[in-house]
C-alpha cells in the first residue's frame, strides 16, 4: 500500500469571537465545532471571509456537523445552520491553537483462537469525537461480541478483532499484517452506525458475493 499516515494533530483550543466579543463555536464546549485537523490561526477577518470556512447542515438546522480535512491543510469551524443565518456583519476573530507533529497511529488488535487458523475479521472505527452512532456504537458492539464469543467457544474459526481509525487505520493494519492475515481471512465485518435506534442492515461487498 502507498498510503501515508498523516501527521498527528494536537489541538488545545479554538473559538470565534463575534463583533460584540461574544465567543461562538467554542471547541472546549463542543469539539465538533472545529474542523478536525485544522491548522493554527489567530486572525481578525470579515464575515464574508469567515463564511468560506464555516460548515453547516441546512437540512438539519439545529445540528452541528462533523467535518475533517486530513489531506488538505486548511482550517474551519462547524456551527448550526440557524446560528449561521443569524451572524451579523462585522469583524470576527478566529483562533485555533493547534499543531501537527510526526507522531504515531495506534490501533487495537486481539485474536480469539479457534479450532482452525482460518479467520473471521471483525473491525470497528475509533476516530470520530463525541458521536454515539457513527463511532462509539461500533466499538461497544465489538467488545460485547468478543465477550460473547469467548464465553461460548471454542469455535471453528479464529476471530480477529480490530479497532482503528477509519480508512487510514485499516490501511496501516494491512501494511503491517496484510501478508500474514491475507491468506487466512475467510470473511470480514465492519461494525458501524449501530446506535441510531433502527433495524441493523448488512451491506454487501462490491462484488455482491459477501
Predicted regions and their residues:
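N-terminal hydrophobic/helix-forming segments and targeting peptides
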Residues: 1-210
